[in-house]
Amino acid sequence: ETGRIHHGGNFQAMAVTNAMEKTRLALHHIGKIIFAQSTELINPATNRGLPPSLAASDPSLNYHVKGVDIATAAYAAELGYLASPVSTHIQSAEMHNQAVNSMALVSARATINSIDVLSMLVATYLYNLCQALDLRALQAEF
């Protein structure tokens, strides 16, 4: 109505940066839960009668999902690394003409990486679940 435009100059896009950081942290927590469940599934002390490492044959010779467990641990650790904030790494640019710069794109790219890692973690967990289900079916008595 007044003919004036008020612009806050929000080129830093901290709202987007922070939203992506919180999203990555949530993905990390989901990954930690899946890792814990996967660990309990392959551990004979917590899996209610399934063989160690979900081995279908002799558990002392067959370490079926040991490698998968190592991968899930690596994925969970990587999710923790990726959950770190990027907003603390803002640098001055243009000979200090731009004192603060947007980290929104960097944060979004890190979130995409987190989604990829979480997808691999979920895939390994689903593999373990399928193996456990097959072993339970072999144990079933009718």
From Swiss-Prot:
Belongs to the PAL/histidase family. Transmembrane segments: none annotated. Pfam families: Lyase_aromatic. The keyword Chaperone does not apply. Its main location: cytoplasm. Disulfide bonds: none annotated. Gene3D superfamilies: Fumarase/aspartase (Central domain). GO terms for molecular function: phenylalanine ammonia-lyase activity. (E)-cinnamate binds at residues 66, 94, 97. It catalyses: L-phenylalanine = (E)-cinnamate + NH4(+). Catalyzes the non-oxidative deamination of L-phenylalanine to form trans-cinnamic acid and a free ammonium ion. Facilitates the commitment step in phenylpropanoid pathways that produce secondary metabolites such as lignins, coumarins and flavonoids. It comes from Agaricus bisporus (White button mushroom). PANTHER family: HISTIDINE AMMONIA-LYASE. Its EC number is 4.3.1.24. Keywords: Cytoplasm, Lyase, Phenylalanine catabolism, Phenylpropanoid metabolism. InterPro entries: Aromatic_Lyase, L-Aspartase-like. Homotetramer. This is Phenylalanine ammonia-lyase. It is found in: Cytoplasm. It is an enzyme of class 4 (lyase). GO terms for cellular component: cytoplasm. GO terms for biological process: cinnamic acid biosynthetic process; L-phenylalanine catabolic process.
